[in-house]
Amino acid sequence: MQRIMNNPDNIVDEMLKGFLKAHSDIVESTENGRVVKAKDIPEGKVGVVTGGGSGHKPAFVGYVGKNMCDAAAVGEICSSPTAAAFLDACKVADQGKGVACLYGNYSGDNMNVKMAVKMAKKAGITVKTVVANDDVASAPKDQREKRRGVAGEVLMWKVGGAKAAKGGDLDEVIAAAQKAIDNTRSVGIGLTPC
């Protein structure tokens, strides 16, 4: 496969620069170069955050904006964002009402989000999570907790973001996002490896 890129070591940073320029009316950069935030986050609402590895556009930065996610943490190609990136995403999304971190069921994301939640608590930010596990091809029915999050994440972000935009409290946002995932099934396939 032919690819158009400059230095592969800079591909994520260059992708983010291009994305930010192309969508400067919707998103903006933060002090952490691996966190993108919505340009206008209404005051007094629950923050909604996501994140994941690069190379899955439009996920994750493409779902930051009005009535969706307020911030996204960005990792390297097919690699989880750092705990610090997830924490910084929570910090920029926090409007004093808590933060809903809605993400996919991948080991690196699970580990780093759990660390970020602990760090956020120390910083005075309440973060609750919903883990997407909609991919029926990745684990049997009786092992749903092992399933990956794939296309269902989009519905989780939209439902959670809409509930936050309507003024729902943190528990209501979490419940709405969880209900979306609980009622979503997808089949993820890959034609080539990362």
Region locations from a protein language model:
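N-terminal amphipathic/basic leader segments beginning at the initiator methionine
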Residues: M1-V48
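Gly-rich Lys/Arg/Thr-decorated short loops/hinges at beta-loop-alpha junctions or inter-strand turns
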Residues: E43-G51, F60-A73, A137-P140
